[in-house]
Amino acid sequence: MTTVTKHKVLLIAGPTAVGKTALSLALAKQLNGEIISGDSMQVYRHLDIGTAKIMPEEQAGIPHHLIDIKNIDQRFTVAEFVSRTTALIIDISARGKLPIIVGGTGFYLQSLLAGYQFGPADNEPDMAYRQAWFDRAAVEGSDVAWMALKQRDPQAATAIAPANLVRVVRALEYVHTTGQLFSEQADTHGDTLDAYTLCLTAERALLYTRINQRVDQMVAAGLEQEARWLFDQGGAMLPAGKGIGYHEWFPYFNGEQTRDESIAKIKQDSRRYAKRQLTWFRNKMSVDWINLLEHPELRASIDQRLASWLS
């Protein structure tokens, strides 16, 4: 029997403005780690302020990956994230270091942990198909998805527990998008990661206050000029132009709203995004929640949890 090597991977997740960067730097130093960005916008060159990108002088000598790897006219798909991150995990682990993935793009993180497979013609997952099964299972129970898999790929159904809805839906989606049996493809990725996910959180009023303050700091640091540059390159027509903190400026640049209205919209969109992030991590992923902003004394408990996981 072939023994599959399990790679330890630490994920630090959570909404924007909750303190992920500071914790990741501290833990990377403590655990001899390297950091992989799990943020879908930090891949873009020249977009530093609006993405809250950690700059080289702030990285404290810790290697950071998946930052500044794309031009603003290039797409960064979940398939590419999974592929690149998997390769980085293997490389970092082989060098005796701990991969630490930091970010708030929940779908990307979930896809990595669940081991979603993306064929060459399937550059993006079928989100509508996947969500339809999650919605149906929420009403009828997870067995309904498993029974469908049993009809389409009995061997896969035998190998997957009915209660493991994420994996069942992954198998159904694979059959749906490729026309091939899930049981016949090498689906080992999800079994090669020994992942531990810390999700930072905070009481909503405090989180929203921090988000508003962060936006003000970004504006003071030159966010408007950064957004103007992006607008002049093509703005909303570019993949990078859809990011929060950027697209809200475009109506102002077109003379359709005021500067203050643009800033208020960035704050509103950022708060709504934080709410969606928390909902995603709560409903779609298995995480350990911790509120360090209001309870810094819990920092010691993180060390205890990690020591147990790493032992």
Swiss-Prot record:
Pfam families, per the entry: IPPT
Enzyme class: transferase
Coiled coil location: none
Gene Ontology terms, MF aspect: ATP binding; tRNA dimethylallyltransferase activity
Catalyzed reaction equations: adenosine(37) in tRNA + dimethylallyl diphosphate = N(6)-dimethylallyladenosine(37) in tRNA + diphosphate
Reported cofactor(s): Mg(2+)
EC number: 2.5.1.75
GO biological process, one term: tRNA modification
Residues flagged as site, Interaction with substrate tRNA: 105, 130
UniProt-listed InterPro entries: Dimethylallyltransferase, IPT, P-loop_NTPase
Region listing for Interaction with substrate tRNA, in residue ranges: 39-42
Sites where the protein binds ATP: 14-21
Annotated positions binding substrate: 16-21
Highest taxon of source: Bacteria
Keywords: ATP-binding, Magnesium, Nucleotide-binding, Transferase, tRNA processing
Biological role stated in the UniProt entry: Catalyzes the transfer of a dimethylallyl group onto the adenine at position 37 in tRNAs that read codons beginning with uridine, leading to the formation of N6-(dimethylallyl)adenosine (i(6)A).
Xref: PANTHER family: TRNA DIMETHYLALLYLTRANSFERASE (PTHR11088:SF60)
Family to which this protein belongs: Belongs to the IPP transferase family.
Name assigned to this protein: tRNA dimethylallyltransferase
Native source organism of the sequence: Lactiplantibacillus plantarum (strain ATCC BAA-793 / NCIMB 8826 / WCFS1) (Lactobacillus plantarum)
